[in-house]
């Protein structure tokens, strides 16, 4: 009886000890789990805070990007409007310059034709005057009263060398011939003057046409440079320097 009681107490002690150990182990595991849970919560909170901070940064960047996009679109719209205005201004200037060049070219062609006609007229007048002068000289040299108007070489004497015994009729004939010669020489001189004036006008018009062509080229270079500079500025690259104006070839008269 005593033995059974002793054995029973020993079993209960062992069982209690086992249960105590199990309880202690469970408590330790519970503490470990609680510590791990707290650590996980802290880590998750840190991750959440970092994610929220990153989200705030991304939201700010998104707002800035949207703002830059709006500003870029506005700048693009302004540049398109400016480009359209420049194109319109350049088109009008180009049309005006081309019209002036065509007008000047037509005037130059007309003056060249006038020069050609004047040259032909001058040549014909010189030939006719020379022929008529030779005829007059021949008649006057054959006349004993009129031969003293010309020298031995055939040149016209400007000073009067009339003789006192010659009549009024002979003097009138001399004066008439001299007047006719002077009129012919004056007509030739006027024709030569018109020819020179026409050539000078052609040179002046060609100079004006060259200046207009330079203005057209300068306007093209200016518009091209402004357009590219606007594109370069929008993309953040180096602006383009304007191209030099080339001189157009001069047309021979």
From Swiss-Prot:
Coiled-coil region(s): 8-222
Keywords of this entry: Coiled coil
Superkingdom in the source lineage: Eukaryota
Span list, region Disordered: 233-253
UniProt-listed PANTHER family: RAB GTPASE ACTIVATING PROTEIN 1 LIKE, RAB GTPASE-ACTIVATING PROTEIN 1-LIKE
Record-given protein name: Rab GTPase-activating protein 1-like, isoform 10
Organism whose genome encodes this protein: Homo sapiens (Human)
The encoding gene: RABGAP1L
């Amino acid at each position: 009886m005593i033995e059974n009681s002793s054995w029973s107490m020993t079993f209960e002690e062992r069982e209690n000890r086992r249960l105590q150990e199990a309880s202690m182990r469970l408590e330790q595991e519970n503490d470990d789990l609680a510590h791990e849970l707290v650590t996980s919560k802290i880590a998750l909170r840190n991750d959440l805070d970092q994610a929220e901070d990153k989200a705030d940064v991304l939201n700010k960047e998104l707002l800035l990007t949207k703002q830059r996009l709006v500003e870029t679109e506005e700048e693009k719209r302004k540049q398109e409007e400016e480009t359209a205005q420049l194109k319109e201004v350049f088109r009008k200037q180009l049309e005006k310059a081309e019209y002036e060049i065509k007008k000047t070219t037509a005037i130059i062609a007309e003056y060249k034709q006038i020069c050609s006609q004047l040259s032909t007229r001058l040549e014909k007048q010189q030939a006719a005057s020379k022929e008529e002068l030779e005829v007059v000289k021949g008649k006057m040299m054959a006349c004993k009263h009129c031969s003293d108007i010309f020298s031995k070489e055939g040149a016209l004497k400007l000073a009067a060398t009339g003789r006192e015994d010659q009549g009024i009729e002979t003097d009138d004939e001399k004066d008439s011939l001299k007047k006719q010669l002077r009129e012919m020489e004056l007509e030739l001189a006027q024709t030569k003057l018109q020819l020179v004036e026409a050539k000078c006008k052609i040179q002046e018009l060609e100079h004006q046409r060259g200046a207009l062509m330079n203005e057209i080229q300068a306007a093209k270079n200016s518009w091209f440079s402004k357009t590219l500079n606007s594109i370069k500025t929008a993309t953040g690259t180096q602006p383009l320097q304007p191209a030099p104006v080339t001189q157009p070839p001069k047309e021979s008269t």
